[in-house]
């Protein structure tokens, strides 16, 4: 399987992809370079597929990759409900794409970045 090195060591590349994938899950869209967006698209689609499987093994695989970040905090009277990025994948995104067989994200190219002229893109979930 081929992948882009992104001018980083393997640990730095894995950390970058984990951070960008978690940000995409939390926010629904991110703006990054085109090469990074193409790599994050692969990992984001894998996380949605794991969410659709929904079993314990898939949940543990997704938990090993997605950062443990708070996605939402809601208050119901005395109770405080905290939702993590992992819970968002399994409770919101997986049911949303239950009848879709892939292609959960889209990449839209934007203007080059000012300063170094890097090709930029917006990566977002398909509605």
From Swiss-Prot:
Pfam families, per the entry: Ribosomal_L17
Family: Belongs to the bacterial ribosomal protein bL17 family.
Molecular function GO labels: structural constituent of ribosome
GO cellular component term of the entry, any: cytosolic large ribosomal subunit
Subunit annotation: Part of the 50S ribosomal subunit. Contacts protein L32.
SUPFAM superfamilies reported in the protein's UniProt record: Prokaryotic ribosomal protein L17
Gene source species: Levilactobacillus brevis (strain ATCC 367 / BCRC 12310 / CIP 105137 / JCM 1170 / LMG 11437 / NCIMB 947 / NCTC 947)
InterPro entries assigned: Ribosomal_bL17 (IPR000456), Ribosomal_bL17_CS (IPR047859), Ribosomal_bL17_sf (IPR036373)
Name of the protein in question: Large ribosomal subunit protein bL17
Gene Ontology BP term (one): translation
Keywords: Ribonucleoprotein, Ribosomal protein
């Amino acid at each position: 399987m081929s992948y882009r090195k992104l001018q980083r060591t393997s640990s730095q590349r894995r950390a970058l992809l984990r951070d960008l994938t978690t940000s995409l899950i939390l926010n629904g869209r991110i703006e990054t370079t085109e090469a990074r967006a193409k790599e994050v698209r692969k990992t984001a689609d894998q996380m949605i597929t794991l969410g659709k499987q929904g079993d314990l093994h898939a949940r543990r695989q997704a938990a090993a990759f997605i950062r443990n970040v708070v996605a939402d905090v809601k208050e119901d009277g005395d109770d405080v409900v905290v939702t993590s990025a992992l819970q968002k994948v399994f409770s919101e995104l997986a049911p949303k794409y239950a009848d879709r067989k892939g292609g959960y994200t889209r990449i839209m190219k934007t203007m080059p970045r000012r300063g170094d002229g890097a090709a930029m893109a917006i990566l977002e979930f398909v509605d």
